[in-house]
């Protein structure tokens, strides 16, 4: 264990998702050895993103404006909404270039162990978006893991009574995997082969 500021930096870096103790230590020493100007730019970038970035008032994707560029894009199909867990999943889907509709970011997935139920997700906001009648299809693109499947099943059952088409991405995505790590071809094929969400 190191002392003072070095250990504090390692501890803070270790709190980041996917960063274990060894990675935190490597990052801390990289920061210590890096050019001070590079580190000033990094600190500025982190501060700027925390000050400027917020959630789109329509879909809850990240943006620096009131609505994100996807919601503002008139070339996108407003009748189809792809429901994802997190903003990073929007980027994963966009990389496929297979989807030209709009999005809705739930802000997570149902996970009773972590105390996350439907009330903690942006499901109410999704239902509000459906009120105008313009939406004809909801594509559920939650992660193919236990929490993602629970969320997809909950949404499909809830939306069934509304009378819109509800589909789920096709297989090809590994069970237990994360959408953001799927390659573009696999994710693109999953969109093409999507199926009815309630079988």
Curated annotation (Swiss-Prot):
One of the protein's GO biological processes: DNA repair
Domain of life: Bacteria
InterPro entries, per the entry: DNA_Rcmb_RecR, Rcmb_RecR, Rcmb_RecR_Znf, TOPRIM_dom, TOPRIM_RecR
Domain Toprim: 79-174
GO molecular function, one term: zinc ion binding
Function: May play a role in DNA repair. It seems to be involved in an RecBC-independent recombinational process of DNA repair. It may act with RecF and RecO.
Protein name per UniProt: Recombination protein RecR
PROSITE patterns the record matches: RECR (PS01300), TOPRIM (PS50880)
Keywords: DNA damage, DNA recombination, DNA repair, Metal-binding, Zinc, Zinc-finger
HAMAP family, A to Z: RecR (MF_00017)
Family from the record: Belongs to the RecR family.
Zinc fingers (C4-type), renumbered ranges: 56-71
